[in-house]
């Protein structure tokens, strides 16, 4: 007999840097899940990614308090800012897009980079082909104030 699913939980955790402190600890603890088991499994699964890359994860938890992880690709905005070479700024030391998208340009990327990002995110996007996925990524670039050349 299959395990009974109680629910699922979406988190965005930095690759290889999961720890039991907030937001991970409280989110798992209030559901009675083993926090350290999650931390070890997540860090092991994200060991091949660049450390610090924000990684969305869907945690499905079962009646016997066990869980399974489904890792997603990093957010399109993160990949675009990285491709544009935007420098980290602010208290959280993260790259920022334009404060006024459409009026100010924060950085530029080539169409080839957009295609590469679209191909990487294809499994997580609601698109039938790479061209449709590129349109989604182009919309994200426009929202970040990143100009596309070529």
UniProtKB/Swiss-Prot annotation:
Keywords: Methylation, Ribonucleoprotein, Ribosomal protein, RNA-binding, rRNA-binding. One of its GO terms (cellular component) is cytosolic large ribosomal subunit. GO terms for biological process: translation. The keyword rRNA-binding applies. GO terms for molecular function: large ribosomal subunit rRNA binding; structural constituent of ribosome. SMART domains: RL11. Gene3D superfamilies: Ribosomal protein L11, C-terminal domain, Ribosomal protein L11/L12, N-terminal domain. The keyword Ribonucleoprotein applies. Pfam families: Ribosomal_L11, Ribosomal_L11_N. One or more lysine residues are methylated. It comes from the Bacteria. InterPro entries: Ribosomal_uL11, Ribosomal_uL11_bac-typ, Ribosomal_uL11_C, Ribosomal_uL11_C_sf, Ribosomal_uL11_N, Ribosomal_uL11_N_sf. Belongs to the universal ribosomal protein uL11 family. Forms part of the ribosomal stalk which helps the ribosome interact with GTP-bound translation factors. PANTHER family: 60S RIBOSOMAL PROTEIN L12 (PTHR11661), LARGE RIBOSOMAL SUBUNIT PROTEIN UL11M (PTHR11661:SF1). Part of the ribosomal stalk of the 50S ribosomal subunit. Interacts with L10 and the large rRNA to form the base of the stalk. L10 forms an elongated spine to which L12 dimers bind in a sequential fashion forming a multimeric L10(L12)X complex. This is Large ribosomal subunit protein uL11. The gene is rplK.
């Amino acid at each position: 007999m299959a395990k009974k699913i109680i629910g699922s939980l979406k988190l965005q955790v930095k690759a290889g840097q999961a720890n039991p402190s907030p937001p991970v600890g409280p989110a798992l603890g209030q559901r009675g899940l083993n926090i350290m088991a999650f931390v070890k499994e997540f860090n092991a699964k994200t060991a091949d990614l660049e450390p610090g890359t924000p990684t969305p994860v869907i945690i499905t938890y079962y009646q016997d308090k066990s869980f399974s992880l489904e890792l997603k690709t990093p957010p399109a905005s993160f990949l675009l800012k990285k491709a544009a070479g935007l420098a980290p700024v602010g208290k959280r030391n993260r790259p920022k897009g334009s404060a006024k998208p459409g009026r100010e340009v924060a950085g530029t990327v080539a169409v080839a980079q957009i295609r590469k990002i679209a191909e990487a995110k294809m499994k997580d996007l609601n698109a039938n082909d790479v061209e449709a996925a590129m349109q989604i990524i182009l919309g994200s670039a426009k929202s970040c104030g990143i100009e596309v050349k070529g």
